[in-house]
Amino acid sequence: MSMRIWSRSSSAYSAIARSSSWFNNSLFSSCLLRFYSNPPKKTKKNTLISLRKSAETANEKFIEKINKEHQLFKPGQIVVDLGCAPGIWSTIAARHVGLFGRVIACDIIPCRLPENSSMIQGNILSMEIQLEIAKAAIRSRNSFFRNQQDHNSASIPYLQSVFEEERDTKEKAKIEDLSADVIMSDLGPPFPMVQGFEFWISKLPYLAMQTNEHLAVKDELDSLYLAQAALLFAIKALKPDGIFLCKVLESSHLRSFAEDLSMCFKCVKKIQFKTKIKDELYAVYFCSGKQLSCHSKLLNI
């Protein structure tokens, strides 16, 4: 009985090799096709990123709409943003006030802002932080007036006047000296954060805002309390023709707050805003024409 020995030169081996190569190539092609035709699975991180992005876009469109309808921001203004993180409202305000204006932002969580802005990290409920906001506004105003005058910035009289202004600012500054054109208040729960540079530079204050019972905004009453604190600050720090924009969680407790706003401002408009994060409904009050006779002791606070 004869036995046939298969070799590489045989036609049968070549046929098997060709069929095997075709099989491997088709398997590889089908794997590629399956990989690229099916979208990747959504992870928790990707979902959080898309949620935050949609929330930022909604906030940006909202404040731009208010600015377009009511001319909220103008060049050269001093704007105060309470609860500024992640800096959406402050960035838009800085874009409109220009280089001769100033945005002074305050929050427990730090954030990056444009060059014509000042970031003060702290709790707005602290009187020291409120004074720091006033000092930042005074410094900005003094700097603007100095730039309008033709002085040699390296001369001794000029430097001496700068030092004297800074000393007077530290010693005599009051909240009433702020004279802000616009005060915005968005004191609420922090935006969701994902792992990255932003999270690691603000990890501790972010966790404090989430867990500390004195800092966390848990319900409508906490949101109302912070809005009332912002109103008391605005009564002292706002210009007579200034604008107060306040965002507060919608609830049945807002009637007394609306009465307080009507006592302090001639014109009060209520705008509703729905967030993308927790699907919560907020009331945004646009207030103008500060009443000079308004006193904090007459309010329902």
UniProtKB/Swiss-Prot annotation:
EC number(s) stated in the UniProt entry for this protein: 2.1.1.-
Keyword Endoplasmic reticulum recorded: no
Catalytic activity as recorded in UniProt: a uridine in rRNA + S-adenosyl-L-methionine = a 2'-O-methyluridine in rRNA + S-adenosyl-L-homocysteine + H(+)
Positions that bind S-adenosyl-L-methionine: G87, W89, D107, D186
Organism of provenance: Schizosaccharomyces pombe (strain 972 / ATCC 24843)
Name of the top EC class for this enzyme: transferase
GO BP: any one term: RNA methylation
Name of the protein in its database record: Putative ribosomal RNA methyltransferase PB17E12.10c
Short name of any one Pfam family annotated for the protein: FtsJ
Residues at the active site: K247 (proton acceptor)
Key words, A-Z: Methyltransferase, rRNA processing, S-adenosyl-L-methionine, Transferase
InterPro entries, alphabetized: RNA_methyltr_RlmE, RNA_MeTrfase_FtsJ_dom, SAM-dependent_MTases_sf
Gene Ontology molecular function terms on file: rRNA (uridine-2'-O-)-methyltransferase activity
Similarity field: Belongs to the class I-like SAM-binding methyltransferase superfamily. RNA methyltransferase RlmE family.
Cellular component, GO annotation: mitochondrion
Keyword Transferase among UniProt keywords: yes
